[in-house]
Amino acid sequence: MIKPIIVGNWKLNGSKKLIESFLKQLNQFLIKYYKICTVVIAPPVLYSHLIQNMFSSDKKNFFLGAQNIDIHFSGPFTGEISPIMLKDIGIKYVIIGHSERRLNHKETNEIIAKKFCMLKEENLVPILCIGETKKEKIDKKTKDICKKQIDIIFNMYGSNAFDNSIIAYEPIWSIGSGNSAAPKEVQCIAHFIRNYVKSKSNHNIENFFIQYGGSVTKNNAKELIYQKDIDGFLVGGASLQLEEFSKIIEITNI
């Protein structure tokens, strides 16, 4: 059985006060689930050390994540973060390709693929977000869009691209809307993604996970995690609410 991975994407949220209160309680909660679930928190990067210091080194199921990297390893690029820097401070998982960055920062598939390759070069775990808009869904282009976003990774990195990697299927129309995709629909797309990646890999792919993201809450997590090809969640707003996030973790492990 695959060990579920639950990632909390805090986006541009958080404070020292929130972290001290939230993680003190989460730390105790995770003791119960350390063998059967991996939990990742991706805060604004400047809070990473504070979070690290609040978790004891014996927490084998807890990891720090980041929300983005630059397309350069170093140099005169004001305000950017390098994967080398993230690795240096103990971050393991990095979200790339989120629709908010595609839209607000005009990140193309090519830019995202380059970031993916940089993460792999540093032995970090990319969490590649893919998904369709509402119009693309209506036009029945979901699978074509997912294929396009996956293909460029294979074209740039090669057939072993998705070993030790995560794809988060996040239908753009559901993010932040409160309207999650139907579980059977999610399973259909996740199954397609898994088979497509396997067919392009030309080997027995290892440590490849598929998450669902898009208005994940304690109310829909149970039915979603029961889907065969869903290995966990990329949680947005709900990951900032201790009771909600803890319940999602608990449900995932039922």
Swiss-Prot record:
Keywords: Cytoplasm, Gluconeogenesis, Glycolysis, Isomerase. This is Triosephosphate isomerase. It catalyses: D-glyceraldehyde 3-phosphate = dihydroxyacetone phosphate. Transmembrane segments: none annotated. Substrate binds at residues 9-11, 176, 215, 236-237. SUPFAM superfamilies: Triosephosphate isomerase (TIM) (SSF51351). Its main location: cytoplasm. One of its GO terms (molecular function) is triose-phosphate isomerase activity. CDD domains: TIM. GO terms for cellular component: cytosol. One of its GO terms (biological process) is gluconeogenesis. Involved in the gluconeogenesis. Catalyzes stereospecifically the conversion of dihydroxyacetone phosphate (DHAP) to D-glyceraldehyde-3-phosphate (G3P). It is an enzyme of class 5 (isomerase). It comes from Buchnera aphidicola subsp. Cinara cedri (strain Cc). PROSITE patterns: TIM_1 (PS00171), TIM_2 (PS51440). PANTHER family: TRIOSEPHOSPHATE ISOMERASE (PTHR21139:SF42). InterPro entries: Aldolase_TIM, TIM_sf, TrioseP_Isoase_bac/euk, Triosephosphate_isomerase, Triosephosphate_isomerase_AS. Gene3D superfamilies: Aldolase class I. Pfam families: TIM. Its EC number is 5.3.1.1. It is found in: Cytoplasm. The active site is at residues 98, 170. Pathway: Carbohydrate biosynthesis; gluconeogenesis; Carbohydrate degradation; glycolysis; D-glyceraldehyde 3-phosphate from glycerone phosphate: step 1/1. Belongs to the triosephosphate isomerase family. Homodimer.
